[in-house]
A protein has these predicted regions:
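Hydrophobic/aromatic residues within well-ordered alpha-helical segments
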Residues: 33, 76, 83, 87, ...
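Hydrophobic alpha-helical connector segments
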Residues: 96-125, 173-180, 209-212
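Amphipathic alpha-helical linker/stalk segments
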Residues: 81-110, 152-161
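Amphipathic alpha-helical segments used for helix-helix packing
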Residues: 107, 120-142, 190-198
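Short hydrophobic clusters on alpha-helical segments that form packing/core surfaces
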Residues: 33, 37-45, 115, 219
Length: 228
């Protein structure tokens, strides 16, 4: 590409390109403010979804003015994008840790446990994800068809290899993964229903341990190679 020229005392000389200024590191206060906003946004988005949530609601939940919030996040989409990226990184970590070199039954048991722990510890994130799915995942479809699909394909291949080696019973690995997602995330997405039906005697924190024992029996008994 030829150099850009500017006029200077009747002569054309190459213009010097300005180098981009280095991004300034965030201060501790800026990071703390962003964390407050993201925490408030998680509450609002998990209740109302992306479309129903407003900047005003998030600012009110964060206890700050709307102009102050917009200084850190100029658009609602930026807040949502940051939340979804953090959530997906956390959400997919247990599946990433699914070890092809491990013993199949303990690996699957550990995965079920981790997913239930996440349903217990991150219910708002789970509901945020469910809301996004119900809206057709317009802001997540690239990740679902890319990073998520690649990861599930990889772990489905691990499950198929275990089946071929006779270590677990043969079944559809994709629907096995979907079923683990559905049954574990139910305890976050439908938490109110679960507690209402179980009642005060069984609807406390112990419900997650009860669920873990049930789901382990449901999945692992069916996957043991001599179970069919």
């Amino acid at each position: 590409m030829p150099p850009i020229k500017v006029k200077n005392a009747g002569k054309s000389v190459p213009a010097r390109r300005k180098s981009a200024a280095p991004a300034k590191a965030q201060t501790r206060i800026q990071r703390e403010k962003q964390d407050v906003i993201l925490e408030a946004a998680l509450d609002v988005f998990s209740l109302h979804g992306f479309r129903g949530a407003t900047i005003d609601q998030i600012a009110e939940q964060a206890g700050m003015s709307k102009p102050n919030l917009l200084y850190y996040f100029p658009r609602k989409e930026e807040i949502h994008k940051r939340l979804m990226k953090t959530m997906l990184d956390t959400w997919l970590q247990p599946l990433r840790e699914f070890d092809a070199e491990g013993d199949p039954i303990p690996e699957i048991r550990s995965y079920i446990r981790r997913k239930l722990e996440m349903a217990r510890d991150f219910p708002r994130e789970s509901r945020l994800f469910a809301n996004e799915m119900l809206q057709g995942a317009p802001r997540l479809i690239d990740i679902l068809e890319g990073e998520l699909k690649d990861l599930v394909d990889e772990k489905a291949a691990v499950l198929l290899a275990w089946m071929d080696e006779g270590k677990i019973a043969r079944t559809d690995p994709y629907h096995l993964i979907f079923s683990i997602w559905a049954t574990t995330q139910h305890y976050a997405d439908f938490d109110v229903q679960v507690r209402a039906v179980l009642g005060p005697d069984r609807g406390g924190e112990g419900r997650f341990e009860d669920a873990a024992r049930f789901l382990e029996a449901l999945f692992l008994n069916g996957l043991r190679p001599n179970s069919r």
